[in-house]
Amino acid sequence: MKDLLNLFKQPGAQLEDFDAIRIGLASPEMIRSWSYGEVKKPETINYRTFKPERDGLFCAKIFGPVKDYECLCGKYKRLKHRGVVCEKCGVEVTIAKVRRERMGHIDLASPVAHIWFLKSLPSRIGLLLDMTLRDIERILYFEAFVVIEPGMTPLERGQLLSDEAYLDAIEQHGDEFEAKMGAEAVLDLLKSLDMTGEARTLREEIEGTNSESKIKRLSKRLKLIEAFLESGNKPEWMIMDVLPVLPPDLRPLVPLDGGRFATSDLNDLYRRVINRNNRLKRLLELSAPDIIVRNEKRMLQESVDALLDNGRRGRAITGTNKRPLKSLADMIKGKQGRFRQNLLGKRVDYSGRSVIVVGPTLRLHQCGLPKRMALELFKPFIFSKLQLRGLATTIKAAKKMVERETGEVWDILSEVIREHPVMLNRAPTLHRLGIQAFEPVLIEGKAIQLHPLVCTAFNADFDGDQMAVHVPLSLEAQLEARALMMSTNNILSPASGEPIIVPSQDVVLGLYYMTRERLDAKGRGMVFTDVQEVHRAHQNGVLDLGARVQVRIREAVFDENGGMNERVHRVETVAGRALLYEIVPDGLPFELVDRDMTKKAISGLVNACYRRVGLKGTVVFADQLMYMGFSMSTGAGVSIGVNDMEVPAEKEKILADAEEEVKDIEEQYASGLVTNGERYNKVVDIWSHTNEAVAKAMMEKMGKDLVEVDGEQKEQKSFNSIFMMADSGARGSAAQIRQLAGMRGLMAKPDGSIIETPITANFREGLNVLQYFISTHGARKGLADTALKTANSGYLTRRLVDVSQDLVVTEEDCGTTEGLHMTPIIEGGDVVETLADRVLGRVVAEDVYKPGTDEVVAAAGTLLDEEWVEHLEQQGVDEIRVRSPITCQTRHGVCAQCYGRDLARGHGVNVGEAVGVIAAQSIGEPGTQLTMRTFHIGGAASRAASINNVQVRNSGSVRLHNVKVVKHHSGNYVAVSRSGEVTVMDDHGRERERYKIPYGAVLSVADGDAVESGQIVANWDPHTHPIITEVEGRVRFYDFVEGVTVAREVDEVTGLSSLVVTDPKSRGNGEHRRMVTDASGKQVEERVAYKDLRPMIKLVDEDGNDLNIAGTDIPAHYFLPAEAIISLEDGAEVRVGDALARIPQESSKTRDITGGLPRVADLFEARKPKEPAILAEVSGTVGFGKDTKGKQRLVITKADGETYEELIPKWRTVTVFEGEHVEKGEVIADGEPNPHDILRLLGVTALAAYVVKEIQDVYRLQGVKINDKHIEVICRQMLRKVGVKDPGESHFLRGEQVDRARVLEANDALEAADKTPATFEPLLLGITKASLATESFISAASFQETTRVLTEAATRGARDDLRGLKENVIVGRLIPAGTGFAYHEERRRAQADPIAAAESAIGLGGGEQPATSETGAGGSDPSEEG
């Protein structure tokens, strides 16, 4: 282990290769060994001569000469005296740069505690001595004595004594005991610790105790003591006798004009320490009174504290201008600290920035670079060329020529620039496509020209955005820029694998316009021999683009074997489409362009082109598309006029109808038929429906034109400009058009509740004052949110990158057979994501069989590409097990098989790809689009009308899942289960639709029935929740006390009365007396407090005996929650499936459970929800035990008769019934599931599925596509740590959090030695926690809480193996990813076997090299096939 600071002792000794960095505590000897002399005086420099003072903070004798090779007094100058020490001034003659690396030291007159180990919680000193922080501070700051050696006295070691107590003890015991105060006392205590003995006793204590909290406390201390023992640090080093002094050039003193000086704050802080130290020395020599010395020692301690970490204890020391001084700790932490400012965020030479303008004539790989800018950026290349040509003799002459900008200079510039890519970057760089390489084209002017198609990737527009240009200098850098970063090599988005180079806005509009059919177009019905003729006809004005014509086209398509087949045939199509097909490359069929080219269709076209024709063809095609789109949209002349916003004529009638309905509801409310909450819900519902209806009418009117064709009226798709913009996907959406020409609809208040009076006007008609005022709420909130959102999104990305930065593909295959189970995602009647989309680009984990047979369709280990997926779809496969990063067994990193396809390249992922960072960027980049709370479009409330039935969309057969039904006397079935679902299967037995069936829904079909499309299979009342009886009998009320547990409400209009259950909280304090039969059959009076009464309905037979639920011996008792409304009378007869009571549902905040970004952050931080769902801890049968005061007791009886109890608060909705069977991990009380519970009860894959689903839901709502595997990669990083359950014979402690890789390595070693390995369970850490808990302390320290991380790492003597990317960037090495991965592998191999490495370098290892190249080919084979 080399000592970093002593490396600089030998002149010119640079740090050679190193593979790890260790951090530890510095012993006083080590600090003295770094030092070149003691700093004795607080002076800095002499203000008259500007020479450093001798023995001061800038002393040249200690730190080295101020000028190169010149001593301070000027006796020795120049290089020939190098290494001489001047006898007059004592300065060594050497370069001045040593003042950046030579350290000094200060010998402290009294020891001082290091504040980090004292105050950084948990206090390390306190933990070692087993004392509280408060006590130790009292000792250190001279408020109390501590007993160090009790001798024969009754005092105890480590006991604190106040002044009086100390004097008393002295009186009593004289000098039999020893007590001290200050850091010396703590130093003595630490020195006298017997670490090994302590560790032994602690281990025994832990074995012998059962209390959790005690174990936690003891193991904390044990861990620290063992860390000290292992690392070779000594506890007494946490108290310092000698203080290192930073080299002077790192804390400079700079003269300003006017004779003043700017100084680094550190100089002030050091000066304070030196002053106090010198004063203390003098006082000790004079043997001053104790109290004065004590005070001075305390001040010394405080000044050292301030130097190390100002403001950590007490008030921060401030400078002249009331601003706290920047201490050593502040230098490294925070955004402005060393890590984030200088090590991770360096500024780059050879770069410039300018405004961007559009470059529609560029090709995809080009950018326009202003001449002046290029001249400046490529200067070194121009100089060398000028010298090479002999046009300039020296660099100076070359410089002159360039400044004069002579003709030859421009010629040489254009030569230098040829084929030399430059990199363009637009801040904020949210994902890797924010920096791309282009070939520069010299242009006049001062703005950079950017190709329009890369705007999406950069998220750039031309409203004044600026971009930076960087020049890759070395040949390797140019090569990488060209091969990896060129815009033409980044066609697909790394987030979703879809093309990102797709036309948008005017290009889309142009292509859409040219491919739209016009029924009344000029030249319809003409016939052409080829596309050239169509061109001529169009240019001569005989033919409109939208005319349907017949034309002969040449179509070239690939056959099965990959050969190209040409066929020429006649098609009937729109003229514009024939013209468009001309630029489509060979290999794509005509049907791809024979449709209206909306943005989606164009994206599909580019995608198909990339998959079938390859990269080069796609690049050329994309450019052609753009040129054509621009020219066509110019020709189309689409513009917006007020008349384009057509308000539908039916609007008035629709509104009038809605007003009527609302009036009805208001009347019902007035007559007491509905509660206020129900009224509000229904009104909001009506207006939501109305808004939909108006929008529908408007779109119908806008989307259709009537034209006269050959004397008759025909209907066609509209050519309304606004409609075309929205329909083509160029700009705008149906929701925006709705506000322009429909009605604005319901608005939301800032708190998210919906204002029940909607804005019936639209922007075309104009808003009145009230309407405008209502709509300002949402609009303002929207703007405020946007500002907060951007910052939050950036922070989320930072946390994600930090947790996943060290995840790299490190091997080809880890050999696991595990994986995730994939099925299509179906919500309601829609297949939201097909199986094909989910498994595309994944590797199959186990053989896939054709449903119902044992024929293997895809073998394990197949990488599924587009063709494979299509094949699987045709075979009717509806579930596949695929490999996933979550289940990957690779220790460090992931393997290529588990990751699957590299989404941005379309083939298997290469070893060395930094998949972690890609995942983090893919999730973080769309973060800015995610709203904080989802109010779209100027605050218009987006709340779907509540659903009250299930209407099937496809015909097929119905399957019911966990639906328990009872047959109603009307012949229908009523659902009496809570988590039931109904699915519709097609003829192949594949699931097409899936719906939730709520409790109390009336089903009109049974399991296995055939249904037609459009049929309603279930319906229910969305605003109330019924309680259904499962048996027939008489109603008997129990615990119904009018005025106490129930209140009778009489409707004034109808005169009908109903009972409403009151809330137990509002019942008052009385007691209720009731008669009960005791064990001997006697009637006894029982007193029950009002609060404990539980109103319920019992069902009894004719004789009044309790009835049981069919098939069980559980009595039919139905408990009634607060607010339940009962409209039956006591003794009424009920039939199976009747409703006994109904509970009104009041819900109408904007349907938006923490939407958007905060939801994503909550999931990744693995936060516990406020009211988590309660999950069943074991499988078994549910029963209810005796209730406690505020909780109900739920008992689960396992199959073997063991019982498990769970106390559930009474206000929680329990979703299971007595006698129901639950599986481990099933929900028993509603709520948001807690991810930690899912992991504990259901395992890693269930957790992954949950997180992926929840996060995808948020992104899907915003229409953002992200591949599942990115979320899985982050999940893998959150599951890095495991909790040790039983340490076995390992050195881990019970409950310790350890990296999974470390436990597995330790277990391998234990198993090899035939010892019992440790058992562990996976732990889920949030991304911030996981980043701070990483094995690499450098990475953690540069993320957050720098002080805490470094303190902890130093006491452990932590070693950083520089595995991740971040650590390597910080120490300035190549990162172990991409091209750096191979470099590091090579180095590792060379170290492991230096002789073989040397041989292979010379070329002696003849047998070896062909082998490696062969395996290389073998490794890349599958990707070529795919």
Curated annotation (Swiss-Prot):
Signal sequence span is: none
Q: Does the keyword Magnesium apply?
A: yes
Catalytic reaction annotation: RNA(n) + a ribonucleoside 5'-triphosphate = RNA(n+1) + diphosphate
InterPro entries annotated for this entry?
DNA-dir_RpoC_beta_prime, DNA-dir_RpoC_beta_prime_bact, RNA_pol_asu, RNA_pol_N, RNA_pol_Rpb1_1, RNA_pol_Rpb1_3, RNA_pol_Rpb1_3_sf, RNA_pol_Rpb1_4
UniProt record, GO biological process? DNA-templated transcription
**From which domain of life does this come?**
Bacteria
Q: Which residues bind Mg(2+)?
A: D461, D463, D465
Give the EC number.
Answer: 2.7.7.6
Binding positions (Zn(2+) 2): C814, C888, C895, C898
The record's remark on the cofactor is: Binds 1 Mg(2+) ion per subunit.
Write out the function statement from the record: DNA-dependent RNA polymerase catalyzes the transcription of DNA into RNA using the four ribonucleoside triphosphates as substrates.
The protein depicted here goes by the name DNA-directed RNA polymerase subunit beta'
